[in-house]
């Protein structure tokens, strides 16, 4: 079973994203900060990450930079999920492969992106 780490400080959104992960046959775990994410990555070794770009008290960009600085994590698939006005092309240098807009995201869109991410991690 594929493993998805969800870094999301809004419990409602974390629960929604966990449901989408389950729908594509993935096991999901959630954390609320970049520090917790790095600890979970070390201990659990997820196959992919979904990251809210606007974490309370810290920036997701700091986590993205941290991930890129580790050779064993640099290729970890990352999906950004946010209400923020962000452009996927601006995030690609940080290793982000997909972007989900919380304001307009449909369940089928999220499931399709999760499936695509996991198909690329075979």
Regions found by a protein language model. Name each.
Residues 11-29:
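Two-component/phosphorelay signaling modules centered on CheY-like receiver
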Residues 61-62, 83-116:
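Alpha4 helix (beta4-alpha4-beta5 surface) of REC/receiver domains from two-component response regulators
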């Amino acid at each position: 079973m594929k493993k998805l780490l969800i870094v999301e400080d809004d419990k409602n959104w974390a629960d929604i994203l966990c449901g989408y992960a389950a729908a594509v046959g993935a096991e999901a775990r959630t954390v609320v900060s970049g520090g917790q994410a790095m600890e979970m990555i070390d201990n659990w070794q997820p196959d992919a990450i979904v990251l809210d770009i606007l974490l309370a008290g810290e920036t997701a960009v700091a986590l993205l930079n941290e991930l890129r600085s580790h050779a064993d994590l640099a290729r970890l698939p990352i999906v950004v999920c946010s209400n923020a006005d962000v452009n996927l092309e601006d995030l690609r240098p940080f290793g982000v492969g997909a972007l989900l807009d919380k304001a307009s995201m449909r369940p089928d869109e999220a499931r399709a992106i999760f499936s695509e991410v996991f198909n690329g991690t075979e």
